[in-house]
Amino acid sequence: MNKFLALLFVLALFANIAFSCEGHPEHDHGDGDHEHDHDESFVKILDSDNFHNSVSEHDVTLVMFYAPWCGHCKTLKPLYEEAAKQLSANKKIAIAKVDCTQHEQLCKQNKVQGYPTLVVFKNGKAEPYEGDRTTKSIVQTLEEELKPTISTLESNEDIEEFKKQHPISVVGFFDNDHDDRFKLFSELAGNNKKSAKFAVVIDKDFSKEHVESTPNVVLFRSFDEPTVAHKGEFDSESLIKFIKGNSVPLLGEINRNTYKKYESIAVPLAYLFIDSTQDNTQVLEDVKKIATSQKGNAVFCWVDMKKFPQQATHMGLSGKVVPAISVDSVANKARYNFDEKETFSFDTVSKWIQDVIGGKVSPFVKSQPEPESNDAPVKVAVGTTFKKLVLDSPKDVLVEFYAPWCGHCKNLAPIYDKLGEYLKDVESVSIVKIDADSNDVPSDIEIRGYPTIMLFKADDKENPISYEGQRNDHMNFVEFIQDNAAIEFKLPSSQTDDNVESKKDSSAKHDEL
């Protein structure tokens, strides 16, 4: 998820936090009962030896990565087992699980962040499970995965029935099934099956009853204008933009139940913040008119500030002014906020939106004030100085992305300061830290948790190297920097040099074992 979809990220976090246990695969809290695993005949037990073969031998495999001590895992367990039992006769589907306290590396490889994590493997390819955590939903979701990506419709009755079954359906009308554009549509359907249900009509005469010319695509939906025909070029970019942009209402509410629909919107996404206890009739009417005029250029949604008061501040607004509006542009990797001191009216907002789309508005960067003095061995970056201190620096730069409330970050602080002190006289290396909770960082930098530590090499700032080693000694970082830096440097003392070599020797011996 793009970092600048900040609202969506927070909504996703709040939606998921109730269904996952915090923890790390390295920490087994020890109150699980592993013996019972072997009594479950319908749930496959996976480990490093059989994992890859198991997820590849079935058309669809659902894997639960869990920890025995996790309360949410214990709650899910009987529902999961019942789903496995109900699906046991279907040899194309498998339900399995991995105990992350026993198979740490396997869980790390699958990027497990909390428990339980559910992943669907379809023909060996991994996708997050996005259904409800109930027996019924698990069964339905996996059975749905087996259905063809594209249905073939042969009559008006077929089309009407298809529309009734699916709130959003996309139908391609073709003369034949060997046209290159038919192949393009089929591939697009396979890659966007979660956005809508796809079908085709392969009949020139029948197609002409629904479209002016073939091939063409029509989107049917249960809201706003029910039938929308594609009018752009018949290529992937245009079709995806058409489908994503028309799969949501002209001005719909975004909340825990709907945020997924907005996740992959390809055009700028405008968030209107309102107070649901007030009369918003005129505001909604005005913004709906703006949304209509900008159709294809932007997608609009509204957020109830009463339900999600922290969302506006996460976008960089004060959270105290309603109505307010913010635009998130994935393409520009930028966020734009309407000045809360300005009068909120149809004219002012309409012009501002037009200027945002036209590239006339400067993006908002969440940033703390730049430190008056930044002479300490560990440099402090903020949102407005990150580019200067890190990306534009000619040095190899080690950066700690932290949050002030993070306990692990607090434990690391004296060690990181010691690292800065130790390397302060090495001209080619800079040690930097940034409060990533209070400052924006470039959206292509993936921060999965705090602290995240990365080395931005002097000759390759676009591909930082993540530090995955121990954090209990500053010399661990020294060794990491020396091994990966673009510019060679000498350590401050031969004694420490010996220490690093000793660690290398120890590591080599460990690898041999």
Curated annotation (Swiss-Prot):
Coiled-coil ranges (or none): none
GO biological process: protein folding; response to bacterium; response to endoplasmic reticulum stress; sexual reproduction
Signal peptide positions on this chain: 1-20
Basic and acidic residues bias locations: 500-513
Protein name in the entry: Protein disulfide-isomerase 2
PROSITE patterns documented for this protein: ER_TARGET (PS00014), THIOREDOXIN_1 (PS00194), THIOREDOXIN_2 (PS51352)
Active site (record annotation): 70, 73, 406, 409
SUPFAM superfamilies the record matches: Thioredoxin-like (SSF52833)
Functional note: Participates in the folding of proteins containing disulfide bonds, may be involved in glycosylation, prolyl hydroxylation and triglyceride transfer.
Annotated region described as Disordered, given as residue ranges: 491-513
Catalytic activity: Catalyzes the rearrangement of -S-S- bonds in proteins
Main location per the UniProt record: endoplasmic reticulum
Thioredoxin domain ranges (all copies): 21-147, 355-486
CC per GO annotation: endoplasmic reticulum; endoplasmic reticulum lumen; extracellular matrix; phagocytic vesicle
Gene from which the chain derives: pdi2
Gene Ontology terms for molecular function: protein disulfide isomerase activity
Top-level EC class as recorded in UniProt: isomerase
Cell compartments where the protein resides: Endoplasmic reticulum lumen
Entry keywords, A to Z: Disulfide bond, Endoplasmic reticulum, Isomerase, Redox-active center, Repeat, Signal
Location of the motif Prevents secretion from ER: 510-513
EC number, as in UniProt: 5.3.4.1
Disulfide bonds: 70-73, 406-409
Similarity comment: Belongs to the protein disulfide isomerase family.
